[in-house]
Amino acid sequence: MNKRPLLLCLGLWVACTLSKPTEKKDRVHHDSQLSDKVHDDAQNFDYDHDAFLGAEDAKTFDQLTPEESKERLGMIVGKIDLDNDGYVTEGELTAWIKKAQKKYVYDNVERQWQEFDLSQDGLVSWDEYRNVTYGTYLDDQDPDNSFNYKQMMIRDERRFKMADKDGDLVATKEEFTAFLHPEEFDYMKDIVVLETMEDIDKNGDGLIDLEEYIGDMYNHDGDANEPEWVKTEREQFMEFRDKNHDGKMDKEETKDWILPSDYDHSEAESRHLVYESDHNQDGKLTREEIVDKYDLFVGSQATDFGEALVRHDEF
């Protein structure tokens, strides 16, 4: 039996549950920056390239001639225009940027897909996932082992059913991606919140009190004095996390904590790209308007000199 999938699950569990006593565990799912480059169009469009293509694929376009960049960009426009009406809206551009930024997620799913799709039908059923991940562990458990594989499987099945939109217990690649990376999908946010609350709620009342909140982040382990950040977290809980000041966090308060709806970098970047490229100011972009501003969207050797990088043909 292949033990790698279960070891991956256990590895993630251990990483989430074990930490140094004074080390803060962060459960917040942050909206990541689109690029580590400075966003200053007066200097260059490197930030925009990373946002539109993803950092790795932006390097590819740096090695193309202007003509090649325009040709490939034109092909990409067809993928962004989801309703095929000949226009790219801010919403479609936002969706594309989010997808480009999630490329690492999809790459991770691709690496695992063949291992779980045992029947090679382009789908992964719950039975396939269960058999590959758990297999004989469910039948041959050490009673002295405190880790409950059956409970872990029940939790996985619940998440699988949530990701499986049509309820047939068979996941498409997109549904399987939502199962493996629920924090990346809006319709999976409730399960992320539920699993987090189950992890932290030790007394089983369905809520998170102050001591449970702190206990999840910090293990006293005989420390005489709490680190300063622990005191700060106590204040954060009482003043901001517990919005109704009843001493506990409910589902909505927990959601606001771990899935903050702050600044959306993808939406901001799509507005910026439309503003800079929309010649007739109708609020949407044609293929011609985008290709005309190819240096803003993707760049080329003519706009980005320097790095000697390996060229590939992903797009």
Curated annotation (Swiss-Prot):
<dbReference type="InterPro" id="IPR011992">
    <property type="entry name" value="EF-hand-dom_pair"/>
</dbReference>
<comment type="similarity">
    <text>Belongs to the CREC family.</text>
</comment>
<keyword id="KW-0732">Signal</keyword>
<dbReference type="GO" id="GO:0042470">
    <property type="term" value="C:melanosome"/>
</dbReference>
<keyword id="KW-0472">Membrane</keyword>
<feature type="binding site">
    <location>
        <position position="289"/>
    </location>
    <ligand>
        <name>Ca(2+) 6</name>
    </ligand>
</feature>
<feature type="binding site">
    <location>
        <position position="278"/>
    </location>
    <ligand>
        <name>Ca(2+) 6</name>
    </ligand>
</feature>
<feature type="binding site">
    <location>
        <position position="246"/>
    </location>
    <ligand>
        <name>Ca(2+) 5</name>
    </ligand>
</feature>
<dbReference type="GO" id="GO:0033018">
    <property type="term" value="C:sarcoplasmic reticulum lumen"/>
</dbReference>
<feature type="binding site">
    <location>
        <position position="175"/>
    </location>
    <ligand>
        <name>Ca(2+) 3</name>
    </ligand>
</feature>
<dbReference type="GO" id="GO:0005783">
    <property type="term" value="C:endoplasmic reticulum"/>
</dbReference>
<keyword id="KW-0677">Repeat</keyword>
<dbReference type="InterPro" id="IPR018247">
    <property type="entry name" value="EF_Hand_1_Ca_BS"/>
</dbReference>
<feature type="domain" description="EF-hand 3">
    <location>
        <begin position="151"/>
        <end position="186"/>
    </location>
</feature>
<feature type="binding site">
    <location>
        <position position="81"/>
    </location>
    <ligand>
        <name>Ca(2+) 1</name>
    </ligand>
</feature>
<comment type="function">
    <text>Involved in regulation of vitamin K-dependent carboxylation of multiple N-terminal glutamate residues. Seems to inhibit gamma-carboxylase ggcx. Binds 7 calcium ions with a low affinity.</text>
</comment>
<feature type="binding site">
    <location>
        <position position="212"/>
    </location>
    <ligand>
        <name>Ca(2+) 4</name>
    </ligand>
</feature>
<feature type="domain" description="EF-hand 5">
    <location>
        <begin position="229"/>
        <end position="264"/>
    </location>
</feature>
<feature type="binding site">
    <location>
        <position position="282"/>
    </location>
    <ligand>
        <name>Ca(2+) 6</name>
    </ligand>
</feature>
<feature type="binding site">
    <location>
        <position position="121"/>
    </location>
    <ligand>
        <name>Ca(2+) 2</name>
    </ligand>
</feature>
<feature type="domain" description="EF-hand 6">
    <location>
        <begin position="265"/>
        <end position="300"/>
    </location>
</feature>
<dbReference type="InterPro" id="IPR002048">
    <property type="entry name" value="EF_hand_dom"/>
</dbReference>
<feature type="domain" description="EF-hand 2">
    <location>
        <begin position="104"/>
        <end position="139"/>
    </location>
</feature>
<feature type="binding site">
    <location>
        <position position="205"/>
    </location>
    <ligand>
        <name>Ca(2+) 4</name>
    </ligand>
</feature>
<feature type="binding site">
    <location>
        <position position="284"/>
    </location>
    <ligand>
        <name>Ca(2+) 6</name>
    </ligand>
</feature>
<dbReference type="GO" id="GO:0005509">
    <property type="term" value="F:calcium ion binding"/>
</dbReference>
<feature type="binding site">
    <location>
        <position position="201"/>
    </location>
    <ligand>
        <name>Ca(2+) 4</name>
    </ligand>
</feature>
<feature type="binding site">
    <location>
        <position position="248"/>
    </location>
    <ligand>
        <name>Ca(2+) 5</name>
    </ligand>
</feature>
<keyword id="KW-0333">Golgi apparatus</keyword>
<keyword id="KW-0703">Sarcoplasmic reticulum</keyword>
<dbReference type="Pfam" id="PF13499">
    <property type="entry name" value="EF-hand_7"/>
</dbReference>
<dbReference type="GO" id="GO:0005789">
    <property type="term" value="C:endoplasmic reticulum membrane"/>
</dbReference>
<feature type="glycosylation site" description="N-linked (GlcNAc...) asparagine">
    <location>
        <position position="131"/>
    </location>
</feature>
<feature type="binding site">
    <location>
        <position position="166"/>
    </location>
    <ligand>
        <name>Ca(2+) 3</name>
    </ligand>
</feature>
<feature type="binding site">
    <location>
        <position position="280"/>
    </location>
    <ligand>
        <name>Ca(2+) 6</name>
    </ligand>
</feature>
<keyword id="KW-0964">Secreted</keyword>
<dbReference type="GO" id="GO:0005576">
    <property type="term" value="C:extracellular region"/>
</dbReference>
<feature type="binding site">
    <location>
        <position position="128"/>
    </location>
    <ligand>
        <name>Ca(2+) 2</name>
    </ligand>
</feature>
<dbReference type="Pfam" id="PF13833">
    <property type="entry name" value="EF-hand_8"/>
</dbReference>
<feature type="binding site">
    <location>
        <position position="117"/>
    </location>
    <ligand>
        <name>Ca(2+) 2</name>
    </ligand>
</feature>
<feature type="binding site">
    <location>
        <position position="203"/>
    </location>
    <ligand>
        <name>Ca(2+) 4</name>
    </ligand>
</feature>
<feature type="binding site">
    <location>
        <position position="85"/>
    </location>
    <ligand>
        <name>Ca(2+) 1</name>
    </ligand>
</feature>
